[in-house]
Structures are given as structure tokens and as C-alpha cells.
């Protein structure tokens, strides 16, 4: 055989794992639409098949946010609602009574989200647009303060509640 010849044979190329992917946090750090498209094209090339888009988040660290401020609990809540930064990266028309918009300035339009879903399907990528609640729901609470939990979370800290666990019904 010459230097440019190959023997007859068979090449089988397939991934070793059924789930091959990752999560992108676009809630805290906006990733432009064109970059997401490029990422998905690269994922397909490397046979990756799962992409979770984290579309909302809070960028607050309460201790640092309230450091040096002598505020009552009510004043702390008001300060956080007025000053803490949030991200909600999907276009929506929702506006609170206070004039606060749910959608961040940097966001994906409805058309862009539909295009990402179509592209993912064509590339055999399982795209999961994820809205993280209740833990990262400050963007919702700024628009709809009535959705805010009013009880004390410290009542549950470190305690096991059989009724809450049973409610999950993991069977």
C-alpha cells in the first residue's frame, strides 16, 4: 500500500455517556444570542446533547449589601428591593404596579428563544430554559411584592419535617 492509501475498515464513532452537557448562567451574566448559537453549534460538533439555560438570578450578598447600614428588618427589606440587582433574561410584558419591569435590559426576545429551541431540536440538543424559583426569585418579588414569603425561614433551619418530605413523593 502507498502512503496515501487506507486499508478497508470500519470506523465507529459514538459518545460514551448518554448525558453530555452543562448549564450556562445567563441570569447573572448575560450571554449574547449569537454566542449561544455558536455554543450550540460547537456542542453538536462535539456530540454534546444537554444545555440548561439559567435565565434568572439575584446578584446580592445580603451581608455585604447591608454592611454599615443600621436598618430595621423592614428597612432592610425595602433597601434590598430597591437596590439589589436581579436578572430576568426572557422578554415579557409584565410590569408591576410600581412600574418595575420584570425583563432585564439585556434579554432574549421571544423570537430568539423560539429560534434557540428550534436550533436545539435540529442539533439533537435537549435545551432546558430554566427559571430558578423560589430561591432566586427577587426579580419576581420586585414586580409582585405580594409573592414574597412572609414567614420566618429560621423556623425550618436544620429541622427535618416529615410532612414536607412526604409531599415530594419521590416514587
Residue ranges and their predicted role:
Residues 1-170:
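Feature activates predominantly on carbohydrate-active enzymes
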Amino acid at each position: 500500500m502507498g502512503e496515501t492509501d487506507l486499508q478497508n475498515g470500519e470506523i465507529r464513532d459514538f459518545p460514551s455517556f448518554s448525558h453530555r452537557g452543562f448549564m450556562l448562567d445567563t441570569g447573572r451574566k448575560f450571554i449574547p444570542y449569537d454566542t449561544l448559537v455558536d455554543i450550540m453549534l460547537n456542542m453538536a460538533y462535539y456530540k454534546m446533547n444537554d444545555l440548561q439555560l439559567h435565565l434568572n438570578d439575584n446578584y446580592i450578598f445580603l451581608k455585604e449589601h447591608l454592611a454599615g447600614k443600621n436598618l430595621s428588618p423592614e428597612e432592610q427589606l425595602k433597601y434590598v428591593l430597591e437596590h439589589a440587582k436581579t436578572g430576568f433574561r426572557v422578554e415579557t410584558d409584565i410590569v408591576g404596579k410600581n412600574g418595575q419591569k420584570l425583563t432585564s435590559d439585556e434579554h432574549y426576545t421571544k423570537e430568539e428563544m423560539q429560534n434557540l429551541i428550534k436550533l436545539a431540536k435540529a442539533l439533537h440538543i435537549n435545551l432546558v430554559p430554566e427559571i430558578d424559583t423560589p430561591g432566586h426569585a427577587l426579580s419576581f418579588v420586585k414586580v409582585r411584592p405580594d409573592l414574597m414569603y412572609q414567614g420566618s425561614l429560621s423556623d425550618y433551619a436544620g429541622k427535618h419535617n416529615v410532612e414536607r418530605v412526604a409531599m415530594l413523593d419521590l416514587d
